[in-house]
Regions:
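Active-site and donor-binding regions of nucleotide-sugar-utilizing enzymes
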Residues: 1-73
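A donor-sugar binding/catalytic signature common to diverse glycosyltransferases
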Residues: 7-15, 156-199
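Structural alpha-helical scaffold elements that stabilize or flank donor/cofactor-binding regions
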Residues: 28, 86, 161-162
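Catalytic cores of nucleotide-enabled group-transfer and carboxylate-activating enzymes in metabolic
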Residues: 43, 78, 92, 143, ...
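Conserved catalytic-core segment of nucleotide-activated headgroup transferases in glycan assembly
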Residues: 64-142, 236, 240-242
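Nucleotide-activated donor-binding/catalytic signature segment of Leloir-type glycosyltransferases, i.e.
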Residues: 138-155
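C-terminal "capping" alpha-helix adjacent to the active site of nucleotide-linked donor transferases
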Residues: 203-220
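C-terminal amphipathic helix plus adjacent low-complexity
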Residues: 216-281
Length: 281
């Protein structure tokens, strides 16, 4: 949310993901000429802020990572079918917890994951964040080594591959949740701190299997997932980046390239402290 204000050019805010609940997501720091939003939910909020501040525009483009998702949506289908065939299972569940010791489900959910795999004829694939405590990594790797229906994925492969392969996601408080929901697939969390919950959240590990069944079949749960797709980012058309380029060109065509933005001394100081000064000569 900060840029080197002294560099020439149109300043465009492109978001990292869908973290609408982060405290600074809606803070306007006056650095940007236009905001490229992911979907109607974000657009409506930023359009209201644009009316309030009066010095930036808003364009709904979608999130650029969705172009990659579109291009690779079925790239790993063969890998998925191979895993299911080798394990003799019918469905693939991804367990992707956060690494934060305060927020992670890792100390509590292991045995219930094993029960879920066994009772619902599922292969549970586990992919951990690189910053996960080594003791948890070692514990789960050793546990999975003795099971045919649990697969531990070591470092090196991106979690997005397994998101595309999975039928269901189990997590806690992770950035992967919204990305998976946008595939219109079920999500179950244990003890999430999210305030607006559009998926199944449980407070006890023993509730996992019931929540799994509910997420797959309940009409209200399915409708909530569709609401996220429709409002957070409906642009799985492969044209997000092109809309962004067109939007930037259109802004310059209408306004030219602004020489500078009106910033108070604090914003200028913050920018310089973050990025440094341009050294002349």
């Amino acid at each position: 949310n900060i840029v080197p204000y002294y560099l020439p050019g149109v300043k465009i805010q492109v978001f990292h993901g869908y973290a609408a609940e982060k405290k600074d997501h809606w803070i306007i720091r006056r650095y940007f000429d236009t905001y490229f939003t992911q979907g109607p939910y974000f657009t409506s909020h930023f359009e209201a802020l644009a009316k309030k501040y009066g010095d930036f525009e808003v364009l709904e483009t979608g999130w650029p990572k969705q172009d990659w998702i579109k291009a690779n949506l079925h790239k790993y289908d063969a890998d998925r079918e191979k895993l299911l065939k080798e394990s003799g299972k019918e469905t693939l569940i991804l367990y992707a917890p956060t690494f934060s010791p305060k927020l992670t489900s890792l100390p509590y959910i292991k045995e219930e994951l094993g029960k879920l795999a066994k009772e619902r004829n599922a292969l549970v694939v586990m992919k951990f964040h690189p910053l996960t405590r080594q003791e948890w990594v070692d514990e789960y790797r050793e546990w999975a080594a003795n099971k045919k229906d649990v697969l531990f994925i070591d470092k090196g492969e991106n979690v997005t591959k397994y998101q595309l392969m999975a039928d269901t996601l189990i997590s806690d408080t992770s950035s992967t949740i919204y990305e998976f929901l946008l595939l219109s697939r079920p999500v179950i969390t244990l003890g999430t701190i999210s305030k607006d919950i559009y998926w199944e959240n449980i407070t006890e590990p023993g509730q996992l299997i019931a929540a799994y069944d509910h997420a797959l079949t309940d009409p209200e749960a399915i409708a909530k997932r569709q609401w996220i797709v429709d409002n957070y980012d409906p642009y799985l058309d492969g044209n997000v980046c092109q809309r962004m380029l067109d939007g930037a060109e259109d802004y310059i065509r209408r306004h030219g390239v602004p020489k500078k933005r009106k910033l108070n001394l604090w914003r200028k100081y913050t920018s310089i402290k973050t990025f440094g000064r341009i050294k002349k000569g």
